[in-house]
Swiss-Prot record:
Paired cysteines (S-S): none
Gene from which the chain derives: MYB23
Expressed in which tissues: Expressed in roots, seed coats, leaves, stems and flowers. Detected specifically in trichomes, and in the cell division and differentiation zone of the root.
Keyword Repeat attributed: yes
Known DNA-binding region: 37-61, 89-112
Keywords assigned by UniProt, alphabetized: Activator, Developmental protein, DNA-binding, Nucleus, Repeat, Transcription, Transcription regulation
Signal peptide region: none
Organism, as annotated: Arabidopsis thaliana
Domain of life: Eukaryota
GO annotation terms (biological process): regulation of DNA-templated transcription; root epidermal cell differentiation; trichome branching; trichome differentiation
A GO cellular component annotation in the UniProt record: nucleus
Protein name: Transcription factor MYB23
GO molecular function per UniProt: DNA-binding transcription factor activity; transcription cis-regulatory region binding
Keyword DNA-binding listed: yes
The protein's role, per its UniProt record: Transcription activator, when associated with BHLH2/EGL3/MYC146 or BHLH12/MYC1. Regulates the epidermal cell fate specification. Mediates the formation of columellae and accumulation of mucilages on seed coats. Controls the elongation of epidermal cells positively in roots but negatively in stems, leading to the promotion of primary roots elongation and repression of leaves and stems elongation, respectively. Ovoids ectopic root-hair formation, probably by inducing GL2 in roots. Controls trichome initiation and branching.
């Protein structure tokens, strides 16, 4: 029962359509065209709501609907479209001329799914993905392994915390870019000569040469 704008209540019929109701609907559409489905009950006396009239026309009474058996070409097209679009029947039906979304859906559920061996959708998904452990068991395993890692590394963590605390107590040394003194440079010069493969007897440096080399090294 539905309330109209004028305040009157209309009780619409539900269930199967009769031959007389189909004839009334077909005559109305031939005369007035498709659309304005809610006006049919007022103008024809048909005790059906606008939605029911629209679905009845589009799925059964329209001359554009192919009510024959599905061909092999249509089956192949529906299967390929279903792989791309899934259960979006309205989009699939638009690409299958003469078929409605209701026809395509019913034909898939009653014929094609069984033909492809899919059966129940949930069963097919489990078969494709394989048997997996329950999420709860995986969570328990992960938690246990994490606990062992934490327990095993407890001592190292404590030692790291101790080092961090000790580092906080030590004053931070400031980096100072100071120029090395002559004494420091002279102390490092012998180490430089150790890298040269030269005999002391064959090569001697005078004090002046030593100072020149030192000055050049500093620069």
């Amino acid at each position: 029962m539905r309330m109209t704008r004028d305040g009157k209540e209309h009780e619409y019929k539900k269930g199967l359509w009769t031959v007389e109701e189909d004839k009334i609907l077909m005559d109305y559409v031939r005369t007035h065209g498709q659309g304005h489905w809610n006006r049919i009950a007022k103008k024809t006396g048909l005790k059906r709501c606008g939605k029911s009239c629209r679905l009845r026309w589009m799925n059964y009474l329209s001359p554009n609907v192919n009510r024959g058996n599905f061909t092999d070409q249509e089956e192949d097209l529906i299967i390929r479209l279903h792989k791309l679009l899934g259960n979006r029947w309205s989009l699939i039906a638009k690409r299958v001329p003469g078929r409605t979304d209701n026809q395509v859906k019913n034909y898939w559920n009653t014929h094609l799914s069984k033909k492809l061996g899919l059966g129940d959708h949930s069963t097919a998904v489990k078969a494709a993905c394989g048997v997996e452990s329950p999420p709860s068991m995986a969570l328990i395993t992960t938690t246990s392994s994490s606990h062992q890692e934490i327990s095993g590394g407890k001592n190292s963590t404590l030692r790291f915390d101790t080092l961090v605390d000790e580092s906080k107590l030590k004053p931070k040394s400031k980096l100072v870019h100071a120029t090395p003194t002559d004494v420091e440079v002279a102390a490092t010069v012998p180490n430089l000569f150790d890298t040269f493969w030269v005999l002391e007897d064959d090569f001697e440096l005078s004090s002046l040469t030593m100072m020149d080399f030192t000055n050049g090294y500093c620069l």
